[in-house]
From Swiss-Prot:
Residues 1-90 form the CARD domain. This is Disks large homolog 5. Residues 116-143, 857-898, 930-1121, 1204-1227, 1243-1266, 1280-1343, 1434-1501 are annotated as: Disordered. The modification Phosphoserine is found at residues 264, 295, 900, 1000, 1021, 1209, 1263, 1334, 1669. It comes from Mus musculus. Changing residue 1642 to P: In allele LP; loss of neuronal function and disruption of interactions between the SH3 and guanylate kinase-like domains. Residues 620-710, 705-796, 1350-1429, 1504-1585 form the PDZ domain.
Length: 1921
């Protein structure tokens, strides 16, 4: 920093640091200017407040470089009011506005004219604009000054007012003024004059100061400018010096080369003269020898010597040729250097222009700075300070002026030096031109020498060429003779074989003719039957509608009757309940008294034992004494202490406490057995020692009298080991609940007697305990005052005998494992010692059949509350004893009542107790699962399980203790219901299946609430049916189901969950099973949307057959874990009818029958309502690795996937983040690309039963089902030229590069189907590509042109997601940005020029260099990008070497596709990467270029919306135009509904029809759309009369098609053509006649030949469908007769996996019986007749790919024989990872690669482009599967296959130059087999086939074929409009 500036900054450092407020902004600007390093910035960030500003100034003072101007610029931008502090050292006051009172002068000038009070003058300068806030530095000074001025102003104002008053009195007369006049003080006058003078001086000083500041600022800016200019000129000077030195060196080098060339030319001239002399001598010698002696020996010697000399000359020639090629290469390099120098000159000129622009901007900034400095005027009241500051400024200005003069002198010197350098450069250029002219002369002389050498060489070779030609002819004749003999033998054999085949074929032809006659007869019969069926169908439909209405009315009446019946039953249940309560209480009392009397009769019973809690039984146990010395350990059991230490409090009996497994006592004694007598020794009131003594004293056998408790259904903890056998899922689900832990004796609950320990509490006072904690439940209990109503889930006994052995042993085992068995009663301990064990987290709600009718209002039960529990007395760990039911105990009649006494009311607060452990339950007859303790939830509150066998209910009304028990009642019909799972409330609504328990062998005993039927709505016509397979890979699938139409039937209504549900009586009507998919949300139920009324006539029989016959393949993979929201539109509901079921339902599963255990074990599909949430066992397919419902696996599209969706279901990209419903599950079970959706054909089959208006007989079109499966059954060979065509294979293909919008479904039609609005539903099917931008759309946040910006990208291992191309003059541009990639997120745009990449300059880099740099692995990337799309567009257009014919893409053929360049959408470079992407700008419509507008100044009317109510099939509107100019309304009939003031008028351009865009549709498409029956229409039209007048009467369509069949014209106007002919269609609705097109036949050069009439696509599709169906009729045995089933199913389906009702298939729709809603509208529907194509004229040479044997030899021969035409594609060696190479292939950088040892040989796109730009055919060395990848890159190679007859033929190939070695037998066989495999798999890609033979013959054929194909027009599949 300069000393003056350093001193100035040091003086104002403190004041500036205190006044600086926006420090962060200043730091940012300084860092951007380079004044602060990153380390200094971090150091500053650590400081805070004023310390940061002080540290900043200290750092700037400490720096050697001068950053004063950077600081000044930063302050000027952020805090301009601080600049005076910087220059005036803090003497300035606050900046004032120009209009405010900022000085004393201004204060005096605005004094009030009237007599204000002194208080109003206290605020000086308040009038006018308010001054800006003063800086902190001068605030005190300003305040003092203002106070002084205010005092003076008060005095002056008072005196002025006095003078004014006196003046007023004086003017009106002296008589009024009686007051004495006081003369003014002379001192005041003097002071006033001095003040005015001082103010004027101050004002002049201020003006001078302002001018000085302005001049200083200007000088500072000029100084900075000249500094920068000087540095740039110095750099340019050094660069020019380097260039001059380089040119000098090159000049010297060229001179040396010129000298060498001249010397070599002289040597060659001398050698030529010597050779001529020598040749003359030789000729003379030869003549002499011939004259003297004509012996042959001498001639041979002369010949040999001549040949030797010829060889020497040839070698010399080769050396000269090599030198000449080197010189040519050097010349080329010199030319490139010259071009680089020219570019450098242009760059310098651009820099000069930029400097001029910068100067202009500096002047503008200077003007702005002057304006900004006016705000910095401050109040300076002290004249001395102002004068001192002015002197300082003058001194500084002088310094700056001196610097300015120095800089100007330097500038003059620099200008002189630059002129000098320019002169030197001009001299170098002139010298260079001279050198180039001399070089041209040398080259011309060399050419002359070369011609002379060639003449000499031709003369020398003339003698040998004749000999070689003779030998070659002889060899060729020999080969021809051998081949002719071999071919003759083969031909004879083939003739014999063909003769036999001809005879057989003649016989087959006769039989086929006979069969055709029979088939014609059958067809006629079938058509007649079809007409009858159509009539019957219509009558049946009307009858079904009447029956449906009657059924609805009957069901509504039935529902009312059921409600009244439920009320009656409710009253009856209340009475019967009270009666049963009294009866049970009396029975219990009688049983208690009986037991009491029985126990009192025994003297051994202790009176302290509670006789009401249990029953006892006595048993005699006998042990065999094996030895005399025996103890308790040998017997295997242990006893309690008895009297001394009782096992139970208050009970002194001796109890068995332990029984060892496998011991003698095992099986005889049980834990808790009471030992009464051992060997006749009474143990009453005895201790353990006495018992042991009695045991050991016995001799022989040991007899023990044991009293044990009878089983009341207690729960036993039973260890159980389950072998999972490799499966991850045990099949057990858990759930929490609220249970009664204890009942306090004497409490109201104990007195009531119905509440027992272990009962689950479902609801308290009608409040369901779902998702409630234990504290909340207890607060509900405490809040009850007068009465309490509980809804309980009772635990009922399951066995009559209780096996309670080894309880304590099980407690010990439970420390290691926790398992459970299905539900047993709970055990109560003796004398009020309740053994409360862990209640199972899954209970079974078992009701007796008479109580099933009593339960009426059972709602959803919750299971999310905590367990109430009580630990086992005397045990450290709680247990859950439960018994495993036997198979014989599964009947309902085997249940016994739980007669537990001493039941009291009151739930014990167990918060202080140990938490209860939750158990997994879902076990089989003998199964439980082993669960480690460490995996059990210690809180026991959120296990997240389900209730697989329990269907609970909560009463919605106050029903007191609504669960009762009574043994052995009659059976009843169960109506299971489901409840939502409360433990897993998700964030979104999910689809979950109902409880499917068919995989459990244990009988499902389910009782739920019976809901009465409600009048069904139209939305109930389709339900879901849920089935599960028993396989381990079972999954849930949606199946459409319809309620039975056979009365009496109560279809499940859609009920509001807020409405109370009522019990329904058992009914004998058989109800069809369905399942409900519910939302697992916060207790809310998502509703299924209603269907249209027209969809109700899908009969239940057909749907049931769908459910029975269709099975999902077991090989289908699991679903994804994502689960779809339950928002299911009617479209998906309707289409789900066609989805195959996973598991096949048993016959019993179709209807309800009286309950039996066996029946329940066979099927577990309950009747569920669509609005009721369900809870069931979650099968393995429901784990997080799977999903359910209608979530369908979408096809995975890779680069090589080109599949057409015949039914139009579009695929979904994989990076899609949302799940959508799909109308088919076809893709669930496969990852192949067979996208033919079965749902579409099934749907059309069902829809065919609905009668609707159809087209006239001449316009009947094939149904969508026929269109769907005919692609594989029409026996038309499909051999398109290019595999990207739609019919390129038997499966079809779809080009991603050319068709960015997915095919639309033919079902997507606004007719009777609810699929008509896919864009308005929540399940709109996703598309392949993002919707393209409109014509004028541009991103608002796009960067400015020519504004470099830094882009930071956190890359990591992910690809960058961009494609790049090189510019014409260097540079790298972004040609594509992938949506969602890291580059897209970072802000890279299409058209960005990459200036730098991680600091590496890419401004002049080539594309290949940039790819290598960008491909480097790094975590963080910094890119300097500049948005400049225009240069890229010009470059890309100039490099484009092929174009589309405009007629092939008329009026936005590429509309909707984002491929192509921004300006010319029809330009396609076959070697450029043009893949559609969101970063690529949208293609502009070419309508503006093809449609001429007459008067541009005339305003076009705005589009309008027209609504038409369509009352008839024909709309009465005539159309004209087409996709070329648009479809216009030609005429509107008088009786048309479109007629009217708000209707259509002639000249209207149809823009939209409904929701469909008609701008690029053909007139036939619009006509077909208008024929479809609709109630109301919505059209968007625009009146364009002038265009209509031009279009009217002219063909308006324009597109190319490829014929896929042969046609012979029968009448004159028809057109004949052959398969693969290209036709140009110009009218799709000639003269308003539907069914034919007018087309031109084109030749190979796309020239029109003949125009004629051809059948339309719809007519041909109908014809093909009819032929297809007729060809399917076959006889299984003799083809003579058909079975009855075959006759019934005359028209058979194609797909074998579809539903078939009989062995031979079921009825298919008759081909002519279709409605208009099955007509496919769009062009992207698969057609077997025509294929839309577009023309590409390739101006550049296409690459050539050779396939077959001996490729290397053929390529080498082609390159050597025709070097100007062919060049092999070089393989680049890359040492990178496999992932990097594959990423390059994915990004279209590499075409193919081969793995070598340690590296990869890669074929790049850049190398192909480089060879093509040299005007040569590139011989590719890639695998056949990469052909499709080339097509994606718009590279269309010529694929030629070399076909040999056999491996022996390959082995026999010879060539003296290219194939010297013999091909081995093994090698030839391998090559032949490989060639055969390629021929089978990739024959559709072959452009031509060359028959194998001699290598020269093969090369000749290849040359001819390549020339022919290059001259042809290339036709590629066109994008659908």
């Amino acid at each position: 920093m300069e000393p003056q500036r350093r001193e100035l900054l040091a003086q104002c450092q403190q004041s500036l640091a205190q006044a600086m407020t926006e420090v962060e902004a200043v730091l940012g600007l300084l860092e951007a200017a380079g004044a602060l390093s990153p380390g200094e910035r971090r150091q500053l960030d650590e400081e805070a407040g004023g310390a940061k500003a002080e540290l900043l100034l200290q750092l700037l003072l400490a720096k050697e470089q001068d950053h004063f101007q950077d600081l000044r610029a930063a302050l000027e931008k952020t805090q301009p009011h601080l600049l005076p502090i910087l220059y005036l050292n803090g003497v300035v006051g606050p900046p004032q506005s120009t209009e405010g009172a900022g000085s004393t002068y201004s204060v005096l000038s605005i004094m009030p004219s009237d007599s204000e009070s002194s208080s109003s003058l206290s605020s000086v300068g308040t009038t006018g604009k308010a001054p800006s806030p003063p800086p902190l530095l001068t605030e005190q000074q300003a305040n003092d000054t203002v106070e002084n001025l205010s005092i003076q102003l008060r005095l002056m104002t008072r005196e002025r007012n006095e003078l004014r008053k006196r003046l007023a009195f004086a003017t009106h007369g002296a008589t009024f003024d009686k007051r004495p006049y006081h003369r003014l003080n002379p001192d005041y006058e003097r002071l006033k004059i001095q003040c005015v003078r001082a103010m004027s001086d101050l004002q002049s000083l201020q003006n001078q100061h302002t001018n000085a500041l302005k001049r200083c600022e200007e000088v500072a800016k000029e100084t900075d400018f000249y500094h920068t200019l000087h540095s740039r000129l110095l750099s340019d000077q050094t660069q020019l010096k380097d260039d001059v030195d380089m040119l000098r060196r090159e000049n010297g080098k060229l001179r040396r080369e010129r000298n060498l060339l001249q010397q070599s030319w002289e040597d060659m001239k001398r050698l030529r003269e010597e050779d001529q002399k020598e040749i003359g001598d030789l000729r003379a010698q030869q003549q002499q020898v011939l004259k003297h002696n004509g012996s042959s020996e001498i001639l041979n010697k002369l010949y040999d010597t001549a040949m030797d000399k010829l060889e020497v000359v040839k070698k010399d020639y080769d050396a000269l040729r090599k030198r000449y090629s080197e010189k040519v290469a050097m010349h080329n390099s010199d030319l490139s250097r010259l071009e680089q120098l020219g570019e450098e000159n242009q760059r310098l000129q651009k820099q000069t222009e930029m400097l001029t622009q910068q100067r202009d901007t500096a002047i503008q900034l200077q003007h702005q700075c002057a304006l900004s400095l006016r705000r910095f005027e401050t109040i300076h009241h002290e004249l001395s300070k102002a004068t001192a500051q002015n002197k300082d400024l003058q001194w500084e200005m002088e310094l700056l002026q001196s610097e300015l003069t120095e800089l100007r002198s330097k500038q003059v010197k620099t200008a002189k030096e630059s002129e000098k350098y320019k002169e030197e450069r001009d001299a170098v250029y002139s010298e260079y031109k001279l050198i180039m002219s001399e070089r041209d002369q040398v080259i011309s002389e060399l050419d002359k020498l070369q011609t002379e050498v060639e003449l000499a060489e031709s003369k020398l070779k003339s003698s040998t060429s004749e000999k070689k030609a003779a030998s070659e002819e002889m060899e060729a004749l020999r080969q021809i003779k051998d081949t002719v003999t071999m071919d003759a033998g083969r031909a004879n054999k083939e003739v014999e074989i063909l003769r036999k085949q001809c005879k057989a074929l003649c016989q087959e032809l006769k039989e086929a003719l006979q069969e055709a006659d029979v088939a014609k007869c059958r067809r006629d019969w079938a058509f007649q039957e079809r007409d009858k069926i159509v009539a019957e169908r219509d009558s049946i439909r009307t009858l079904c509608d009447n029956l449906r209405r009657e059924r609805d009315r009957a069901v509504s009446e039935l529902a009312e009757a059921l409600r009244s019946l439920d009320d009656t039953r409710k009253q009856k249940n209340d009475v019967s309940r009270e009666l049963k309560e009294l009866k049970e209480q009396m029975e219990c009392q009688l049983e208690k008294e009986a037991r009491f009397r029985q126990l009192m009769a025994h003297s051994s019973h202790d009176s302290a034992i509670d006789t009401d809690s249990m029953e006892w039984e006595t048993e005699v146990v006998e042990f065999e004494r094996e030895t005399e010395d025996i103890d308790l350990k040998a017997l295997g059991f242990d006893m309690a202490e008895g009297v001394n230490e009782p096992c139970f409090p208050g009970d002194c009996g001796i109890f068995v406490t332990k029984v060892d497994k496998g011991s003698i006592a095992d099986g005889r004694l049980r834990v808790n057995d009471w030992l009464l007598r051992i060997n006749d020794v009474d143990l009453i009131n005895k201790d353990k020692k006495q018992a042991i003594k009695a045991l050991l004293n016995g001799e022989g056998a040991i007899n023990m009298v044991v009293r044990r408790r009878k089983s009341l259904g207690g729960k036993v903890v039973t260890p159980l080991h389950i072998n999972l056998s490799g499966q991850k899922d045990s099949g057990i689900s858990l759930e929490n609940g609220v249970y009664a832990a204890a009942v306090v004796p004497g409490s109201p609950a104990a007195k009531e007697g119905s509440l027992a320990v272990g009962d689950r509490i479902v609801a308290i006072n009608g409040i369901a305990l779902d998702n409630k904690s234990l504290n909340e439940c207890e607060s509900l209990l405490r809040s009850c005052q007068d009465s309490l109503t509980l809804s309980l889930l009772k635990v009922f006994p399951q066995s009559s005998s209780w096996s309670g052995q080894n309880i304590f042993e099980n407690i010990k085992d439970s420390d290691r494992m926790l398992s459970c068995r299905a539900h047993g009663p709970e055990v109560q301990a003796h004398n009020k010692r309740n053994l409360l064990q862990h209640n199972n987290s899954t209970q079974t709600d078992i009701f007796y059949t008479d109580r099933l009718e009593d339960r009426k209002e059972l709602g959803h039960s919750g299971g999310s509350s905590s367990f109430l529990h009580k630990p086992f007395s005397g045990s450290s760990s709680p247990v859950s004893p439960q018994a495993c039911p036997s198979t014989s105990e599964r009947s309902l009649n085997s249940f016994r009542s739980d007669t537990s006494a001493e039941r009291g009311y009151g739930l014990v607060d167990m918060r202080s107790q140990r938490p209860l452990l939750s158990f997994e339950t879902e076990v089989g007859p003998c199964g439980a699962v082993e669960v480690p303790l460490d995996k059990i939830d210690p809180e026991g509150s959120n296990s997240g399980g389900t209730w697989p066998k329990a269907v609970l209910g909560s009463t919605s009304g106050p029903e007191k203790l609504s669960v009762y028990k009574k043994p052995k009642q009659r059976k009843s019909i169960f109506d299971p219901n489901t409840f939502k799972r409360p433990q897993t409330p998700p964030k979104i609504d999910y689809l979950l299946p109902g409880p499917g328990l068919t995989h459990s062998p244990q009988p499902s005993k389910r009782v739920g609430s019976l809901t009465p039927p409600k009048p069904p709505r139209r939305s109930d016509s389709i339900k879901f049916q849920h089935r599960l397979e028993t396989s381990s890979e079972s999954e849930a699938t949606l199946v459409g189901s319809s309620p039975s139409t056979s009365p009496p039937s109560a279809p499940p209504p859609s009920m509001d969950p807020s409405e109370p549900t009522h019990a329904s009586p058992p009914r004998k009507a058989r109800v069809r099973i369905a399942s409900s998919y519910h939302s697992e949300g916060d207790g809310d139920t998502s509703y299924l949307p209603a269907k249209k009324p027209c969809d109700e006539d899908l009969t239940s029989q057909k749907v049931d057959e769908l459910g029975q016959k269709r099975r999902r393949p077991k090989s289908a993979p699991s679903f994804r874990p994502k689960i779809s929201p339950v928002v299911i539109p009617a479209q998906c509901l309707e289409e789900q009818e066609c989805v195959p079921a996973i598991g096949e339902l048993s016959p019993e599963g179709q209807e309800w029958s009286p309950y039996s255990p066996g029946h329940a074990s066979r099927h577990g599909n309950p009747l569920l309502y669509p609005n009721r949430p369900s809870v069931g066992t979650v099968p393995r397919s429901m784990t997080p690795g799977t999903t359910v419902g209608s979530i369908l696996r979408n096809p995975i599209y890779t680069v090589r996937s080109h599949r057409v969706l015949p039914c139009g279901s579009p695929p979904v990209p994989r990076d899609a983040g949302s799940q959508s419903l799909s109308p088919s599950v076809q893709h669930q079970g496969r990852l192949s690309l067979d996208l033919s959706h079965r749902a579409c054909s099934d749907y059309s089959e069902m829809r065919a039963s609905q009668g609707s208006n159809s087209l006239p007989s001449s316009a009947r079109l094939g149904s969508s089902s026929n269109l769907q499966f005919k692609a594989e059954r029409i026996k038309i060979p499909l051999t398109p030229r290019y595999p990207r065509s739609v019919m390129g294979s038997d499966r079809g293909s779809l080009s991603h590069s050319e068709c960015s919008t997915p095919p639309r479904s033919p079902l997507n039609i606004d007719t009777l189907s609810s699929c008509s609005q896919p864009q308005t539903t929540a399940s709109t099917l996703p598309r392949i590509a993002v919707n393209p931008s409109s014509h004028g759309e541009r991103r608002k946040d796009r960067p400015f042109v020519e504004e470099p910006r830094h882009v930071k990208v956190q890359k990591g291992s992910e690809p960058l997601g961009i494609s790049i191309v090189s510019g014409e003059k260097g540079g790298v541009y972004v040609s594509k940005v992938t949506l969602g990639s890291i580059a897209h997120q970072a802000g890279l745009e299409y058209g960005d020029q990459l200036l730098e990449f991680n600091g590496i300059n890419l401004r002049s880099a080539t594309e290949q260099q940039a790819r290598l740099i960008i491909g480097q692995q790094c975590d963080t990337i910094t890119i300097l990008a500049q948005y400049n799309p225009h240069i890229h567009q010009l470059n890309s257009h100039s490099r484009s070497s092929s174009h589309l014919d405009p007629a092939a893409t008329p009026h936005s053929t590429l509309q909707g596709s984002s491929a192509g360049t921004p300006e010319h959408p029809s330009v396609i470079d076959p070697l450029m990467e043009q893949d559609e992407g969101p970063g690529t700008p949208p293609a502009k419509q070419s309508a503006s270029s093809t449609r001429s507008v007459g008067d541009t100044t005339k305003k076009t009317p705005d589009p309008r919306i027209v609504f038409i109510k369509k009352s008839q099939l024909d709309l009465g509107v005539h159309l004209c135009g087409g996709n070329l100019h648009g479809v216009f309304v030609a005429e509107v009939e008088d009786d048309s509904p479109a007629k009217g003031p708000d209707g259509l008028v002639p000249g209207d351009l149809i823009l939209e029809y409904g929701s469909l865009d008609m701008r690029s549709r053909t007139v036939e498409d619009v006509y077909v759309e208008m024929l479809k029956p609709k109630d109301s229409l919505r059209l968007k039209v625009q009146y364009r009369h002038e265009e209509f007048t031009r279009v009217k009467g002219l063909p308006g369509d324009s597109f190319y098609i490829r014929a896929l069949y042969d046609r012979l014209a029968e009448v004159e106007p028809e057109l004949s053509f052959k398969k693969d002919d290209i036709l140009y269609v110009d009218d799709t609705l000639p003269q308003g006649v539907f069914g034919s097109w007018m087309a031109w036949q084109l030749d190979e050069n796309a020239q029109k030949i003949q125009r004629g009439q051809i059948p339309s696509k719809y007519v041909m599709d109908q014809e093909f469908s009819r032929r297809l169906s007729m060809s399917e009729v076959k006889d299984d045995n003799t083809a003579k007769t058909l079975s009855a089933a075959a006759r019934r199913s005359f028209f058979r389906r194609k797909h074998k996996h579809k539903r078939s009702g009989s062995k031979d298939g079921k009825d298919l729709l008759a081909l002519d019986t279709f409605s208009n809603d099955s007509i496919p509208l769009f062009e992207d529907s698969v057609s077997l007749a025509y294929q839309r194509v577009q023309k590409v004229d390739c101006t550049s040479l296409r690459p050539v790919l050779l396939l077959g044997p001996l490729l290397d030899v053929v390529k080498e021969m082609l390159v050597n024989e025709a070097p100007g035409k062919f060049c092999r594609c070089p393989l680049e060696v890359m040492k990178a990872s496999q992932q990097a190479i594959e990423r390059g292939v994915k990004d279209c950088l590499f075409v193919d690669y081969k793995r070598r040892s340690g590296h990869f040989d890669v074929t790049t796109v850049a190398s192909i482009k480089e060879i093509t730009e040299k005007n040569r055919h590139c011989l590719l060395d890639i695998a056949p599967h990469a052909i499709e990848r080339l097509h994606h890159m718009h590279i269309y190679p010529i694929v030629i296959f070399i076909r040999y007859k056999s491996a022996k033929h390959i082995k026999e190939q010879r060539d003296p130059v290219y194939l010297r070695d013999k091909v081995t037998q093994r090698h030839s066989k391998e090559q032949f087999e490989t060639a055969q495999k390629i021929d089978q798999e990739y024959s559709r890609y072959f452009t031509g086939v060359v028959q194998g033979g001699a290598l020269s013959s093969i090369c000749t054929q290849i040359l001819a074929m390549v020339s022919q194909e290059q001259s042809k027009v290339l036709w590629i599949p066109a994008c659908p409009p």
